[in-house]
């Protein structure tokens, strides 16, 4: 059951000029459901991406990186669900390449102008023949349908959009994502595609995709597992008529970055809210560190702890688990006497131990909520970090135990 999350509405997801969405049913895993998405891009676009750091990265991830590095203009993306094409060796690469080739031939493109993406079961051969056979049946779709076409264990589709004004020109940012389990940076079993009609040079788009990913998709965890297929793609079509963004010093750069961040954070949070079996959405804020890195270490120690997450599921104010997680986060020479721990606005621990004024009823009241903030004040610097996570429920175990059955 998703936590305070609603399915996207097509009317709230404006089209992005220069982007065409098409979907089809290939019967990869579930007959009759949309499981192939093709994103066609007009000439003059720019594409950037960041990908999983898992050493067993999937064949389509490898091809995406190679095609982007080739320097050709990307004109199409092809996404399949139901099969990850990971752990499939040379054969998996050949199958992914055959899908790229078929999409390219359909639209008179070079194979290198197509980026492939897959998500689903690992160690299974990609049914490339089914995907290729479904291409003639592709039909136009809106962003909401596109979001549905990339779902796996997601219970709800995920999409977001923003509109902004750059120099008197209307600019649109719209994106979709999928993910529900195996979520932990960098990045997650996550596919994210965000498009804008703003005009951005390749160097600036590469910078934007990294900055946006770090503050959104790289700040979430559901279960601490890092997928083989993570991909976050940023597309600039340049068709809004707004000024070209070619420097991070331009006000337009910051305007666009803010809109992209809002969309990406909404998508990233939706993944956590739809975490497999999630009943609670938890924000972990860590402040007062010497570096962002150590703040994130503390935040993730809390956010991925099974003991912490099961306590949240049970609404059990067993908050010593939070202190234990902070203690093993690996922060060098941490002075616990200067640390403060809050549950929402309730001061739970300070000066090395339990706050004398803290009452368990206060903690219980917070733990009963569906949305909770854990705040840690390290008291040793000015850096901060924020991470989003969810609880562990019985349903998480059931979903993953039954995943292939």
From Swiss-Prot:
The keyword Translocase does not apply. It catalyses: N(2)-acetyl-L-ornithine + L-glutamate = N-acetyl-L-glutamate + L-ornithine; L-glutamate + acetyl-CoA = N-acetyl-L-glutamate + CoA + H(+). Substrate binds at residues 152, 178, 189, 276, 400, 405. Gene3D superfamilies: ArgJ beta chain, C-terminal domain, L-amino peptidase D-ALA esterase/amidase. Its main location: cytoplasm. The record marks 188-189 as: Cleavage. One of its GO terms (molecular function) is L-glutamate N-acetyltransferase activity. Belongs to the ArgJ family. This is Arginine biosynthesis bifunctional protein ArgJ. It comes from Chromobacterium violaceum (strain ATCC 12472 / DSM 30191 / JCM 1249 / CCUG 213 / NBRC 12614 / NCIMB 9131 / NCTC 9757 / MK). The gene is argJ.
